[in-house]
């Protein structure tokens, strides 16, 4: 019934790739590349075609087929499947390359290192030790043709054709009959008298010496060449000489050879071998050992082969995160290995892990993800960012740890181009409004302003019109000087997003107010920005036809190209604020401040741009900010430098009062009335339903420190404020000011989202005078209360000695 017969080769689940065999191995087998039919995964297929009159070779091939199926060891070629018919033998193994071809390719690429060879020889010797000491088997074919390399660079021992038992129960060693293989036989095999005393491993260790010589010097021409070590490293030469010694009795056991080479200073005593040995036993290591290993791994990855990192280190890192408790220490080596992957491999292997990491509550992991986002952001698609990453990232805006808040703000620069309309224009702006108004850390408020300036072009036209002017105006009233600089530079960076009316009526009045700022850096930037905006206005005034060209971006949709230009306007104006992050790790103060150049955003053609000037150290160096924000009368203990919850980061209200006192030299009463006015308008707008989240103007709690400077002494009795004088005419005149109706502007209520017009330009002169007078009376009342309390304490406590208070 021959028509019921089936071709076993056709039903075999693996197929050969139609290519010539690899290598031309001496012996009965031909090595082909293949793949699994179901999945397409690559494999190697050793093929032996049965030929008439070659019974001896057929028996050798069948014996090897049997050995492949029964021997299992990490350093021996892994058997996957096999096929035995009357016409052929197929042995399917993991995908490998002959060692000779691999070494030649590595040398041509200029990437072969002694580290790779040391670990490869370690694996071959370990396989021989397993065969001789554990299985009592003699390999009898150790040579270059019997060693293969997998895709991770691991060396595997194959060539099991001529293996026999060391106990003699299976007969003597089979005859090879192949001159290419017989040249590796030790000299004692030529002595037929049998009087030579040798160990069971002696012949294989001689062949190991031949393999070492060929790895470093190329194909062995004759046995006499073994006397010259050639390019064999000096640390390996003494052990090599033991292997090729004429006396087989002194050749070391494979286990002892490994021990000798692993001694301090030995050829196999290096970081690469130690890393591989740890990875082989990582499942039984203690958690503390794993933590230490992954922490030190990043330093060594640069010296390791790329294939090893991709195919051996990466799976262990992914496993450690998925099933272990390695935590944040996995991130740094994970992203370092990720650089070796293609975009497709990165999407398949690393992105799922990254997405899962963002949902972690571990602060260390969250902050490291934010710090290293630049390495993987290009592999994230928009749906993944908006649905799986952004909802977890925004929790960082509410974190009590300043370092996490700071890194969350910075990460928005990378995420903004991938955010959808709702997340970018609604959710993100809500958090930015709260941070800029209420965050107690001046550097974080400053970086929020900087980030807004960089992502401004990604916002929708309506959001830009509603947000940018109000946000940057608020920043110019921040008591933290770098925040005021950031507000000015924010206007300059986004100058193309404002209409000429907004430039003249909203932006220039704000900038002009900063020309009398106590900080010279603020004044300098204000003057430059004013000149830039005036230049635009003047050019449009001279040639009104330029108006359309100048305002082309005002109502334009969000543009990534515009965002790229804005992103370079000043770098991170508070780049040094990363000290908040480093402060989480280090307890030592930062170094002295340095000056940083802040380049301006390029202006439209025909409009002169302000010349880039170095910004003083104050807005660019974290160490100075920390000193500026600390209470100068309080000395902190250095041991508490990294305790965020307990650390005194300074009182912005106290700092604001001292700044206000300095401002009195620039304008009498004007700053006080301005701050009072803003505070009052903020109080009104805070009653809107969305004031807790979506209001830049409603959340000005930090500005109240400008309103009540307790250190300022009240003016003498009878003193009149400058605003109380009638500068327009005689005091006895009862006529109203004929220009009053022109100068007075109706006060407008803030819109429900409170992103609208700033209230600083809408209050009348009379209300400013009344509020200034109320502020003065409030300070006087506060001073009296403090004096009364001091008097009460003196009466209650009694007399006090010099330097000590009397105990109750």
Swiss-Prot record:
Domain Protein kinase: 14-314
Interaction with COPB1: region residues: 793-808
Compositionally biased intervals (Basic and acidic residues): 681-690, 765-775, 782-795
Keyword Hydrolase: no
Low complexity: compositionally biased ranges: 556-566
UniProt feature, compositional bias: Polar residues: 587-600, 660-680
Quaternary data: Interacts with GORAB. Interacts with COPA, COPB1 and COPB2. Homooligomer. Interacts with AP2B1.
The protein, known as: N-terminal kinase-like protein
Protein species of origin: Homo sapiens (Human)
């Amino acid at each position: 019934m021959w028509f019921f017969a089936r071709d076993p080769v056709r039903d075999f689940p693996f197929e050969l790739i139609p290519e010539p065999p690899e290598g031309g191995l001496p012996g009965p087998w031909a090595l082909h590349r293949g793949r699994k039919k179901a999945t397409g995964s690559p494999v190697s297929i050793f093929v032996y075609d049965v030929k008439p009159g070659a019974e001896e070779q057929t028996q050798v091939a069948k014996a090897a087929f049997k050995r492949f199926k029964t021997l299992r060891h990490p350093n021996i070629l892994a058997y996957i499947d096999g096929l035995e018919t009357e016409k052929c033998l197929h042995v399917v193994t993991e995908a490998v390359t002959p060692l000779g071809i691999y070494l030649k390719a590595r040398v041509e690429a200029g990437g072969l290192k002694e580290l790779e060879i040391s670990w490869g020889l370690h694996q071959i010797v370990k396989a021989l030790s397993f065969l001789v000491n554990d299985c009592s088997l003699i390999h009898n074919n150790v040579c270059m043709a019997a060693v293969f390399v997998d895709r991770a660079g691991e060396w595997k021992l194959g060539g099991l054709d001529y293996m026999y038992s060391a106990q003699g129960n299976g007969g003597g060693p089979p005859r090879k009959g192949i001159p290419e293989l017989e040249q590796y036989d030790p000299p004692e095999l030529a002595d037929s008298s049998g009087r030579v005393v040798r160990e069971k491993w002696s012949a294989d260790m001689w062949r190991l010496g031949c393999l070492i010589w060929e790895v470093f010097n190329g194909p062995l021409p004759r046995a006499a060449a073994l006397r010259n070590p050639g390019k064999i490293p000096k640390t390996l030469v003494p052990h090599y000489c033991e292997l090729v010694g004429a006396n087989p009795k002194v050749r070391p056991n494979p286990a002892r050879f490994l021990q000798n080479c692993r001694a301090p200073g030995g050829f196999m005593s290096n970081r690469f071998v130690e890393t591989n040995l740890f990875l082989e036993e990582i499942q039984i290591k203690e958690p503390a050992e794993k933590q230490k290993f992954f922490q030190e791994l990043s330093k060594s990855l640069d010296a390791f082969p790329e294939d090893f990192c991709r195919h051996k280190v990466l799976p262990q890192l992914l496993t450690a995160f998925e099933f272990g408790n390695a935590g944040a220490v996995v991130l740094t080596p994970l992203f370092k290995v990720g650089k070796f992957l293609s975009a497709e491999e990165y999407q398949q292997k690393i992105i799922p892990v990254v997405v899962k990491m963002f949902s972690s509550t571990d602060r260390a992991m969250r902050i490291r993800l934010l710090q290293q986002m630049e390495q993987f952001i290009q592999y994230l698609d928009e749906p993944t960012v908006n649905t799986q990453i952004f909802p977890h990232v925004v929790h960082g805006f509410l974190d009590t740890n300043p370092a996490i808040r700071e890194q969350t703000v910075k990460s928005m620069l990378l995420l903004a181009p991938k955010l959808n309309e709702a997340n970018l224009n609604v959710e993100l702006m809500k958090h930015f409004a709260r941070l800029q108004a209420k965050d107690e850390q001046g550097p974080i408020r400053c970086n929020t302003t900087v980030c807004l300036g960089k992502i401004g072009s990604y916002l929708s036209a309506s959001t830009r019109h509603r947000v940018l002017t109000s946000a940057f105006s608020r920043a110019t009233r921040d008591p933290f000087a770098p925040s005021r600089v950031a507000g000015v530079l924010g206007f300059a960076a986004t100058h193309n997003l404002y209409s000429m009316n907004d430039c003249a009526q909203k932006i220039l009045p704000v900038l002009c107010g900063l020309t009398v700022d106590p900080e010279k850096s603020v004044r300098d930037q204000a003057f430059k920005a004013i000149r830039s905006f005036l230049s635009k206005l003047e050019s449009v005034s001279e040639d009104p036809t330029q108006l359309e060209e100048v305002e082309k971006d005002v109502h334009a949709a969000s543009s990534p190209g515009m965002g790229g230009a804005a992103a370079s306007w000043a770098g991170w104006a508070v780049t040094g604020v990363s000290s908040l992050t480093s402060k989480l790790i280090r307890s030592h103060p930062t170094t002295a401040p340095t000056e940083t150049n802040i380049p301006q955003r390029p202006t439209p053609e025909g409009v002169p741009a302000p010349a880039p000037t170095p910004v003083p150290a104050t807005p660019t160096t974290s160490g100075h900010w920390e000193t500026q924000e600390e209470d100068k009368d309080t000395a902190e203990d250095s041991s508490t430098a990294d305790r965020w919850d307990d650390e005194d980061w300074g009182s912005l209200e106290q700092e604001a009062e001292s700044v206000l006192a300095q401002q009195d030299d620039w304008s009498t009463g004007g700053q006080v009335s301005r701050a009072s006015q803003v505070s009052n308008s903020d109080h009104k707008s805070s009653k809107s339903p969305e004031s807790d989240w979506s209001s830049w103007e409603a959340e000005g709690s930090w500005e109240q420190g400008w309103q009540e400077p307790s250190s300022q002494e009240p003016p003498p009795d009878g003193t009149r404020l400058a605003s109380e004088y009638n500068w327009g005419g005689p005091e006895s005149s009862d006529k109203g000011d004929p220009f009053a109706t022109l100068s007075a502007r109706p006060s407008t209520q803030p819109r429900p989202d409170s992103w609208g017009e700033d209230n600083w330009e809408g209050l009348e002169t009379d209300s400013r005078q009344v509020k200034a007078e109320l502020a003065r009376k409030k300070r006087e009342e506060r001073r009296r209360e403090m004096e009364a309390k001091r008097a009460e304490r003196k009466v209650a406590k009694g007399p006090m000695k010099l330097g000590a208070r009397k105990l109750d």
